[in-house]
């Protein structure tokens, strides 16, 4: 992009002042006298049109009488009072009175430029690059700023927040906090936006809510297939137990774990779904209590010139699952009975309703009347759980898509009721 269209520079800025970023640029516009000629003029005068990212070359403007007219913004080299600066076709259209060249003033402001352009105008030139990389989970953007960028962290975060409409919270990992503790679990510093690390992520019609400041949640994927949900979740440092009964799917899942290098966070299983539900609950608890398997260590990138590597980030394995995912819409609800009594004997571990998992079940609703879906799905869930479940018990009911005229694909989410989890006898 030409320097002419870049924002003004202020390398002394430490607190963002959007009003500083304003620019007035004199240009030439071609007034298309008959709007029907716009496609033709746009095509044949393409070499003279203004080409700047995020700026439209065709604009609508009202004249003194309030009538709308179409203008084509031209490149800066074209002068309205010097036809020799325009391409031959543009000159020809002027002579034929198809267009009329006139002066135009382009006003640019803070909203006109993106994150990289603003940061290039305010960060010191001797910094190697603009810090652009961040991890996004729901509304939260997570930065991991290197030392040289820390004096500008609030400035960086504020601009990042402004330029990403889906972000409302920006945090930075604090490298030096917690180095003396057993678990270095992502201490966070709020840099900009709302002080809210409870994020909501949508995946294949399901809604997952978790606290980003508390890493290492555990998820059980009961019908995982080759890992389309499990692999991305493990990459976010979520402990995933992934299961599939099909030996070929299991084989592919194991291969995908290796290729994607997520073996520390993803454990594959090849079991019947009901058996997996019951066994995984006990297996995870045992893992969390075993000193040799109760945590995962992740190397922490060292700072430039640092002689000794920093302590690793240590993520403890939780004792219980936060979520169970059951994506087999034709029969997933029939496996819900496996949760009946599955937590029996674990009352000392699961000390509150909030420690019981959110269950996400995919299912079909075979009716063209979608208004009946919630009631019908709740009745199906109730039948298999052995407990009445109403619409008020659901965390979420998502219409994923219409599969056929009389069949709709849903994802329903609810927290496992305590009287089901601790039922006296497990039901086959």
Curated annotation (Swiss-Prot):
GO terms (BP aspect): mitochondrial tRNA methylation; tRNA N1-guanine methylation
Segments of skewed composition (Polar residues): 287-297
Catalyses which reaction(s): guanosine(37) in tRNA + S-adenosyl-L-methionine = N(1)-methylguanosine(37) in tRNA + S-adenosyl-L-homocysteine + H(+)
One term of GO molecular function: tRNA (guanine(37)-N1)-methyltransferase activity
Subunit structure: Monomer.
Annotated binding of S-adenosyl-L-methionine, by residue: 244-245, 272-273, 327
Protein name: tRNA (guanine(37)-N(1))-methyltransferase
Entry's EC annotation: 2.1.1.228
Transmembrane intervals: none
Pfam assignment, any one: TRM5-TYW2_MTfase
Family: Belongs to the class I-like SAM-binding methyltransferase superfamily. TRM5/TYW2 family.
Principal cellular location given in the protein's record: mitochondrion
Organism listed in the record: Tuber melanosporum (strain Mel28) (Perigord black truffle)
Keyword Oxidoreductase: no
PANTHER family: TRNA (GUANINE(37)-N1)-METHYLTRANSFERASE (PTHR23245:SF36), TRNA METHYLTRANSFERASE (PTHR23245)
GO cellular component: mitochondrial matrix; nucleus
Keyword flag Mitochondrion: yes
Compartments, record wording: Mitochondrion matrix; Nucleus; Cytoplasm
UniProt superkingdom: Eukaryota
Function: Specifically methylates the N1 position of guanosine-37 in various cytoplasmic and mitochondrial tRNAs. Methylation is not dependent on the nature of the nucleoside 5' of the target nucleoside. This is the first step in the biosynthesis of wybutosine (yW), a modified base adjacent to the anticodon of tRNAs and required for accurate decoding.
InterPro entries according to UniProt: MeTrfase_TRM5/TYW2, SAM-dependent_MTases_sf, TRM5-TYW2-like_MTfase, TRM5/TYW2-like_N, tRNA_Gua_MeTrfase_euk
Region (Disordered): 287-311
Keyword terms, alphabetized: Cytoplasm, Methyltransferase, Mitochondrion, Nucleus, S-adenosyl-L-methionine, Transferase, tRNA processing
